[in-house]
């Protein structure tokens, strides 16, 4: 039987279906549809509830939210309007072909859709059949209708697959506005990317609505219709410029700021200064800097109650919030950035920030780097995203269901979030976005929208015309943020991954110590920013495989400085590796293991030491030196620039009778981050000659041992200050190579992995019958100049010989097996020996260990050029089979990926760092003395320094609150006095290692007291332990 050629129309959808002329076709489609419905697990007589209901049904993957208790499911009387068994599904299927991605819940625009649904469908031109009936014939007609809709698609099979996927995801109707789509994405995924623009109609819903597991955001109309009540546990903020004059005024102010910012942008693009001004505008409008979180929280609650009572709605206009918490400020900042065309990303929630009620903004400044914008503690401060990657396991019980209660926990921690990324000159990765640092011209074409060229007469329309707001489509499941995986760093190379106990540490407020310090020091946030900015610099483009050649042109200065640097490499005869270059720990991101976002932080603290040069070269220009004095921190991403600046400063210093030049922190930080590209090629050649003068010191007393463990300290091998070479001798190093210390990878038998460090893995190995430790770098893509600098470091390390320095045996200098081979020390690190449960170290042995460490450090400080460790800590002191302590990780600190705030291991780095280093102030070799004082404290208290604090808290306590570890009464007074001297705030008052050695030797012979108090965890009173004989 043929079906008449007429249109079958679904009145709820308005979809016109094509006629089918043959029974066989109809029957085939009916059978296919039945199979399709079976796949969807939908029975033919199943009916849907009204889509306009606020209480939505539970789905597999999402949580539903009950907004109003007054709404209820629609009754199913025959004379009541209702959604027919398949009309809703048909509507949904018909939209699949037009929709690329999931959309918000089908509760949106429910009222409009319900009005268009009719109770009947025309069949054969005359019959009106109630779709709610149980008539099999009607059910078959419905199946035919669905099959016909599918057949109208270009690719029915692909459409079915997409339909099943979307249905399982609980997708929504296609009639939603772009603003609703973005609101749903922000609510569901907790983040909006650089491409996502906040439009009128966007609303941010926060709070616990019900315990259902379905994930459907309620429509705005339902939220606005909810009566004001103290019992409501959610809040909503609406962006609606047409009804929010305050928001319009703020946007106009932002446009005015953008117009004026052109004068401070040398490249013509919006720079970080504009971002700071926008942040200040947001902070000032929403209550100013947060000094007392409790007061801010009380003010917010008072304003919230007042607005709800005045407006008679639970939905508050964004512009009406003159007091704002972190999530409100972040939303306003994102809106203002969108209005002026500044790329901005916003994230919120536990996954990104460590708290459900905190939101943060990320921007890409004119240097191509990504920064977290502080809108709370010190509005306008930019913190590099890679330097805030602190990882903490939060106590879930600390967060209550009420948004008001949640507010009290992290009200002032918007910039202290836990989400970290590694963009820099590498690729930034989150689950939804991956960006690379590009040149200024390229950023205009990037996904983030790029920088906006601002003209003095800029207006709102100009901005809109120049940067059209694109309707952000719903991304697929890959847009869900990928959970961050941190490459764990152990205190010692031989100790493996960090202990679970440290990772289980619960912290209610990651920034509590910083907040306390801020009360005493209003400039704390800015200072902290400087510290983090220092530590988050990344290596130059040609260093890693993830970086592409075109990124080398990130700035004009970068390109020019690179050429100048090559020129100096041919002619410059001075060695200018200043102390600040020694920190060159490349803040590299995650190993090429899983390509996930890496969490790192600034471990390398580059000290602004003096640049001393004894050569007579004068090839640098005064202008370069002047640039070195004034270089802004934003240029730190171009590592090559810093090397050129250091060279220029050194050359000028050589021709001047005045005191040596101290470079600014930015130059030091840049050099530090340059992995093994710390200096120019000429410097590498000079270092070879400089090493010859002192390389044999102490060689006779060396005893073979091995250890290759430990995380290489941030500034170790780069600590050379000067070189004695002059004249034509420097050219001889051109022909020098590392062939005499190069080891072929094939000659090494690699065994089990014994450690996981900050820049690689450590394996136990055998080399020609000798037990060795093989430190294999995670970054195997060093080429050209970077590889040459690595070899230069190898040349320096091979010259060091001392009984208390870990023996360097050779290196594999050819990718893909770049490795360092050292002696193997079977007892591992001093840290592990001190803090293991059954410690058998008596006082006499610990005193000898302290003396060993002092001898090793005194040797490094006596080298010419001087070697400053800058990451001296008990995990970097290794113990051989004879209990002799040796210093390690002083030569390859530039290879470090992790930084002092990023460690999740039981021993970070901030715990041992000097306060001036934590504050990003100029530091010299005396910073090692402070670190040694902490090691002394460890040895004679047998406790872990700052064991109950995370690294960020240590930064605040030591660096800004001037706190020191408590020295127990049972510690020998002479030792206690020596520790106190090592911890002097003024580094000039700290003793040298020679003086420390003299003090310890006086204590070595007469050992008084046979009982050693033993520490008890979380107790100030320590029991005693009988002295063990050697």
Curated annotation (Swiss-Prot):
Keyword ATP-binding: yes
Signals that turn on the gene: Down-regulated by salt treatment.
Reaction(s) this enzyme catalyzes, per UniProt: L-seryl-[protein] + ATP = O-phospho-L-seryl-[protein] + ADP + H(+); L-threonyl-[protein] + ATP = O-phospho-L-threonyl-[protein] + ADP + H(+)
GO molecular function annotations of the record: ATP binding; protein serine kinase activity; protein serine/threonine kinase activity; protein serine/threonine/tyrosine kinase activity
Top-level EC class: transferase
Gene Ontology cellular-component terms listed: mitochondrion; nucleus
Keyword annotations: ATP-binding, Kinase, Nucleotide-binding, Nucleus, Serine/threonine-protein kinase, Stress response, Transferase
Purpose: Acts as a negative regulator of salt tolerance. Mediates sugar response during early seedling development.
Residues where ATP binds: 754-762, 775
BP terms from Gene Ontology: response to salt stress; sugar mediated signaling pathway
Tissue expr: Expressed roots, rosette and cauline leaves, and at lower levels in flowers and siliques.
Protein name: Probable serine/threonine-protein kinase SIS8
Entry's localization field: Nucleus
Its EC number(s): 2.7.11.1
Organism lineage: Eukaryota, Viridiplantae, Streptophyta, Embryophyta, Tracheophyta
UniProt record similarity statement: Belongs to the protein kinase superfamily. Ser/Thr protein kinase family.
Biased composition (Basic and acidic residues): 426-435, 458-471, 560-580
Subunit structure: Interacts with UGT72E1.
Recorded coiled-coil stretches: none
One Pfam family per UniProt: EDR1_CTR1_ARMC3_pept
Matching InterPro entries: EDR1/CTR1/ARMC3-like_pept-like, Kinase-like_dom_sf, Prot_kinase_dom, Protein_kinase_ATP_BS, Ser-Thr/Tyr_kinase_cat_dom, Ser/Thr_kinase_AS, Ser/Thr_Kinases-Pseudokinases, UIM_dom
CDD domains: STKc_MAP3K-like (cd13999)
Organism field: Arabidopsis thaliana (Mouse-ear cress)
């Amino acid at each position: 039987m043929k079906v008449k050629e007429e249109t079958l129309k679904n009145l709820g959808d308005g979809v016109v279906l094509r006629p089918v002329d043959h029974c066989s076709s109809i029957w085939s489609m009916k059978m296919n549809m039945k199979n399709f419905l079976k796949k969807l697990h939908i029975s033919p007589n199943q009916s849907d509830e009204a889509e306009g209901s606020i209480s939505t049904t539970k789905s597999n993957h999402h949580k539903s939210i009950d907004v109003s208790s007054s709404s209820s499911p629609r009754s199913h009387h025959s004379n009541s309007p209702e959604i027919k068994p398949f009309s809703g599904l048909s509507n949904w299927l018909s939209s699949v072909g037009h929709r690329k991605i999931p959309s918000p819940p089908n509760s949106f625009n429910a009222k409009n859709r319900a009005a268009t649904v009719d109770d009947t469908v025309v069949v054969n031109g005359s019959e009106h059949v109630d779709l709610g009936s149980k008539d099999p014939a009607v059910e078959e007609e419905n199946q035919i209708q669905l099959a016909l809709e599918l057949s109208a698609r270009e690719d029915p099979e692909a459409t079915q697959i997409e339909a099943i996927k979307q249905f399982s995801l609980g997708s929504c109707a296609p009639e939603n506005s772009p603003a609703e789509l973005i609101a749903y994405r922000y609510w569901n995924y907790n983040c909006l990317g650089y491409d996502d623009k906040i439009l009128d109609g966007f609303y941010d819903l926060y709070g616990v609505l019900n315990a259902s597991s379905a994930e459907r955001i309620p429509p705005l109309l339902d939220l606005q219709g909810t009566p004001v009540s103290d019992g409501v546990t959610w809040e909503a903020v609406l962006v609606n410029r047409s009804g929010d004059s305050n928001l319009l005024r703020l946007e106009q102010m932002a446009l005015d700021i953008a117009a004026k910012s052109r004068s401070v942008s040398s490249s013509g693009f919006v720079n970080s200064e504009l971002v700071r001004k926008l942040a200040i505008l947001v902070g000032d409008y929403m209550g100013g800097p947060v000094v007392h979180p409790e007061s801010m929280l009380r003010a917010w609650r008072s304003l919230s109650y007042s607005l709800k009572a005045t407006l008679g709605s639970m939905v508050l206009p964004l512009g009406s919030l003159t007091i704002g918490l972190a999530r409100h400020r972040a939303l306003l900042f994102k809106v203002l950035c969108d209005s002026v065309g500044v790329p901005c990303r916003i994230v919120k929630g536990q996954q990104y920030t460590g708290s459900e009620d905190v939101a943060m903004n990320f921007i890409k400044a004119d240097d191509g780097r990504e920064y977290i914008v502080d809108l709370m503690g010190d509005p306008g401060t930019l913190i590099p995203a890679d330097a805030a990657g602190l990882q903490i396991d939060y106590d879930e019980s600390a967060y209550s269901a009420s948004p008001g209660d949640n507010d009290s926990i992290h009200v002032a921690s918007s910039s202290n979030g836990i989400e970290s990324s590694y963009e820099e000159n590498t690729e930034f990765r989150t689950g939804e976005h991956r960006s690379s640092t590009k040149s200024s011209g390229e950023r205009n074409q990037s996904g983030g929208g790029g920088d906006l060229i601002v003209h003095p007469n800029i207006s709102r329309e100009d901005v809109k015309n120049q940067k059209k707001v694109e309707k952000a489509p719903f991304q697929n499941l890959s847009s869900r943020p990928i959970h961050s995986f941190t490459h764990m760093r152990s205190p010692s190379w031989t100790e493996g991954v960090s202990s679970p106990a440290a990772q289980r540490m619960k912290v209610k407020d990651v920034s509590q110590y910083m907040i306390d310090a801020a009360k005493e020091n209003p400039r704390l946030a800015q200072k902290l920013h400087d510290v983090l900015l220092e530590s988050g610099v990344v290596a130059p483009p040609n260093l890693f495989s993830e970086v592409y050649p075109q990124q080398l042109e990130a700035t004009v200065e970068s390109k020019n400085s690179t050429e100048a640097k090559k020129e100096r490499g041919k002619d410059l005869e001075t060695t200018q590796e200043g102390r600040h270059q020694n920190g060159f720990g490349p803040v590299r991101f995650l190993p090429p293991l899983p390509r996930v976002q890496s969490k790192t932080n600034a471990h390398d603290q580059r000290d602004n030491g003096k640049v001393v040069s004894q050569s007579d070269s004068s090839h640098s220009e005064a202008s370069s030196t002047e640039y070195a004095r004034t270089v802004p921190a934003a240029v730190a991403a171009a590592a090559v620039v810093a090397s050129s600046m250091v060279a220029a400063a050194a050359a000028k210093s050589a021709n001047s009778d005045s005191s040596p030049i101290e470079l600014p922190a930015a130059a030091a930080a840049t050099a530090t981050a340059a992995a093994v590209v710390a200096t120019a090629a000429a410097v590498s050649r000079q270092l070879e000659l400089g090493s010859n003068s002192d390389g044999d010191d102490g060689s006779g007393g060396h005893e073979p041992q091995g250890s290759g463990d430990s995380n290489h300290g941030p500034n170790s091998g780069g600590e050379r200050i000067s070189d004695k070479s002059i004249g034509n001798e420097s050219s001889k190093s051109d022909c020098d190579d590392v062939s005499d210390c190069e080891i072929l990878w094939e000659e090494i038998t690699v065994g089990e992995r014994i450690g996981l460090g900050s820049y690689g893995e450590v394996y136990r190995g055998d080399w020609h019958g000798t037990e060795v430790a093989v430190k294999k770098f995670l970054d195997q893509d060093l080429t050209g100049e970077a590889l040459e600098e690595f070899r230069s470091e190898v040349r320096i390390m091979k010259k060091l010989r001392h009984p208390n320095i870990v023996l360097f045996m050779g290196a594999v200098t050819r990718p893909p097996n770049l490795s360092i081979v050292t002696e193997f020390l079977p007892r591992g690190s001093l840290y592990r020996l001190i803090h293991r449960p059954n410690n058998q170290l008596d006082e006499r042995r610990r005193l000898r260990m302290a003396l060993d460490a002092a001898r090793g450090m005194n040797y490094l400080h006596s080298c010419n050029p001087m070697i400053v460790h800058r990451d001296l800590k008990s995990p970097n002191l290794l113990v051989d089979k004879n209990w002799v302590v040796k210093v390690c990780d002083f030569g390859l600190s530039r290879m470090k990926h992790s930084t002092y705030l990023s460690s999740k291991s039981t021993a970070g780095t901030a715990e041992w760092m000097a306060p001036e280093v934590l504050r990003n102030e100029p530091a010299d070799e005396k910073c090692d003395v402070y670190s040694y004082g902490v090691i002394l404290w460890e040895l004679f208290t047998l406790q872990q320094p700052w064991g109950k604090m995370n690294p960020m808290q240590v930064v605040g306590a030591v660096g800004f609150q001037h706190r020191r570890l408590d020295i127990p009464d049972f510690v020998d007074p002479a030792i206690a006095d020596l520790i106190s001297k090592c911890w002097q705030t003024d580094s000039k008052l700290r003793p040298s290692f020679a003086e420390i050695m003299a003090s310890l030797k006086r204590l070595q012979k007469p050992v008084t007291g046979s009982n050693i108090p033993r520490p008890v965890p979380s107790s100030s009173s320590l029991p005693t332990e009988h002295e063990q004989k050697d």
